[in-house]
Amino acid sequence: MTIRYPSGQQPPNVGRAEQPIVAPHSSSFAKRGMSLEKEINDANRYYLATEQAVIYKKPTPIQLVKVDYPKRSAAVVKEAYFKRPSTTDYNGVYQGYYVDFDAKETRGKLSFPLKNFHQHQVDHFRRCLAQGGVCFAFIRFTTLDLTYLLPASDLIAFWDQQGRGGRKSVPLTTIKDRGFRVKTGLTPVLDYLPALDQLIAANQAKGADHE
């Protein structure tokens, strides 16, 4: 089956078998060449196997273009296109909380460009927050080897300011101040639950202040 992006290009990983998780010998060696998405996926599989959290990457919607029916009881998809996801990349449950987030990388050293997000993703964050969800942006500065969880509420605030003529990026200094650092380890390489615990605790503290 041929699966293509809207541009007509084929995705790089179609047809490849999912690789098993192998415990790395050192965090620096294990991280070499790994994308943020792969590290998150590996961490999620580890959390699922150890019954710490149930978090999955949402499948990308596919638009079918050509389907053959060699048999009445079977259909064979010959060509399809990946559609733009309608929400965010990941969601699941952790300690009774609904968790929803998206992962982005930037090679910048001073700020994170807001153009990496889309309006529909920000709107989705708003809806999830209104229902009490724990939402955030996974942001990695690749050249600095820094990864943070930025609360969705802060991302939304900068997004709205951008629409009113404000800056079109979030300064790294702000992300360090309002976000939660995700440190690397061994198994998993990107252990983000401690940072998520900090975010949940901060949300609870804010809730207590408003009671």
UniProtKB/Swiss-Prot annotation:
The record marks 104 as: Transition state stabilizer. It is found in: Cytoplasm. Binds 1 Mg(2+) ion per subunit. It comes from the Bacteria. GO terms for molecular function: endonuclease activity; magnesium ion binding; nucleic acid binding. It is an enzyme of class 3 (hydrolase). Its EC number is 3.1.21.10. It catalyses: Endonucleolytic cleavage at a junction such as a reciprocal single-stranded crossover between two homologous DNA duplexes (Holliday junction). GO terms for cellular component: cytoplasm. Pfam families: RecU. Its cofactor is Mg(2+). GO terms for biological process: chromosome segregation; DNA recombination; DNA repair. Keywords: Cytoplasm, DNA damage, DNA recombination, DNA repair, Endonuclease, Hydrolase, Magnesium, Metal-binding, Nuclease. Mg(2+) binds at residues 87, 89, 102, 121. Belongs to the RecU family. Endonuclease that resolves Holliday junction intermediates in genetic recombination. Cleaves mobile four-strand junctions by introducing symmetrical nicks in paired strands. Promotes annealing of linear ssDNA with homologous dsDNA. Required for DNA repair, homologous recombination and chromosome segregation. This is Holliday junction resolvase RecU.
